[in-house]
């Protein structure tokens, strides 16, 4: 497999602990893992070995890249079966899980998933809107899985609840190669008010040692 140098050191992938009903979801998880390997990008994810989480982590690990799984201790019996993949970091709760994954990553990608995936996705979008980080956020919109969510967000823009600038935080594409390419080209935007906000959590969430990705100041 030919490797391509990326601006990202590590990408956080949000996805389901289930595999979904369509084979295309499973294929997309594997393709995303392979794309990260091709671009020499490491993975941080929710730490499970089942569902789409298991597929993407196995693809990255088998391709020779580092895998960091962050998982609450309570969920380990449920989401980890058999041999673990890569490095597993146990944390106390869901809040620590999200903060640690965000701190470790240079960008975020959401594969299809359920409530947990949506909650993680929307939180990092909100953090970007508030200027807590400047990291790209991407939706891998497999077979139009996220079409309804994007329609809802566009409706919120039309009704004045989300600004057009905040809408542009979200990058979406139907396949991994196109999505990662768009994330590589992403440039964050901030309005005058957001750019002046100072957050206590900025350094912990936005700074990753050795990263070439711009962080909030």
Swiss-Prot record:
Please state how the activity of this protein depends on pH: Optimum pH is 6.5.
Expression across tissues is: Expressed in roots and shoots. Detected in the epidermis of the root elongation zone, cotyledon and leaves, in trichomes and pollen.
Does the entry feature the keyword Nucleus, yes or no? Answer: yes
Q: What happens when the gene is disrupted?
A: No visible phenotype under normal growth conditions; due to the redundancy with other LOG proteins.
Tell whether Hydrolase is among the UniProt keywords: yes
Instruction: Name the EC number(s).
Output: 3.2.2.n1
Sorted alphabetically, the keyword list is: Cytokinin biosynthesis, Cytoplasm, Hydrolase, Nucleus
What GO cellular component is one of the record's annotations?
cytosol
Q: Name one GO molecular function term.
A: cytokinin riboside 5'-monophosphate phosphoribohydrolase activity
Q: Where does substrate bind?
A: 79, 97-98, 114-120, 126
What the entry lists under Pfam families is as follows:
Lysine_decarbox (PF03641)
Q: Which reaction does it catalyse?
A: N(6)-(dimethylallyl)adenosine 5'-phosphate + H2O = N(6)-dimethylallyladenine + D-ribose 5-phosphate; 9-ribosyl-trans-zeatin 5'-phosphate + H2O = trans-zeatin + D-ribose 5-phosphate
Q: Which SUPFAM superfamilies match?
A: MCP/YpsA-like (SSF102405)
Family annotation (InterPro entries): LOG, LOG_fam
Q: Where in the cell is it found?
A: Cytoplasm; Nucleus
| Top EC group | hydrolase
Tell me which Gene Ontology terms the entry assigns under biological process.
cytokinin biosynthetic process
User: Family, per the entry?
Assistant: Belongs to the LOG family.
Known role: Cytokinin-activating enzyme working in the direct activation pathway. Phosphoribohydrolase that converts inactive cytokinin nucleotides to the biologically active free-base forms.
Q: Which NCBIfam families match?
A: Rossman fold protein, TIGR00730 family (TIGR00730)
What the entry lists under PANTHER family is as follows: LOG FAMILY PROTEIN YJL055W
Name this polypeptide is given: Cytokinin riboside 5'-monophosphate phosphoribohydrolase LOG7
Gene from which the chain derives = LOG7
């Amino acid at each position: 497999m030919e490797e391509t140098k990326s601006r990202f050191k590590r990408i956080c992938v949000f996805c389901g602990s289930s595999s979904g009903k369509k084979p295309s979801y499973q294929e997309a998880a594997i393709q995303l893992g392979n794309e990260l390997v091709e671009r020499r990008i490491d993975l941080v994810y929710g730490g499970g070995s089942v569902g789409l989480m298991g597929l993407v982590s196995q693809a990255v690990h088998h391709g020779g890249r580092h895998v960091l799984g962050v998982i609450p201790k309570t969920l380990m019996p449920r989401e980890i079966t058999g041999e673990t993949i890569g490095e597993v970091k146990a944390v106390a709760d869901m809040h620590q899980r999200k903060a640690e994954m965000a701190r470790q990553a240079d960008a975020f990608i959401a594969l299809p998933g359920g409530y947990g995936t949506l909650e993680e996705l929307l939180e990092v979008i909100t953090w970007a809107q508030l200027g807590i980080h400047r990291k790209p956020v991407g939706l891998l919109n497999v077979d139009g899985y996220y079409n309804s969510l994007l329609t809802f967000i566009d409706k919120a823009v039309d009704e004045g609840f989300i600004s057009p600038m905040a809408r542009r935080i979200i990058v979406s594409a139907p396949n991994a190669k196109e999505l990662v390419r768009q994330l590589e080209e992403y440039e964050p935007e901030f309005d005058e008010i957001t750019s002046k906000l100072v957050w206590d959590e900025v350094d912990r969430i936005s700074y990753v040692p050795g990263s070439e990705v711009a962080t909030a100041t």
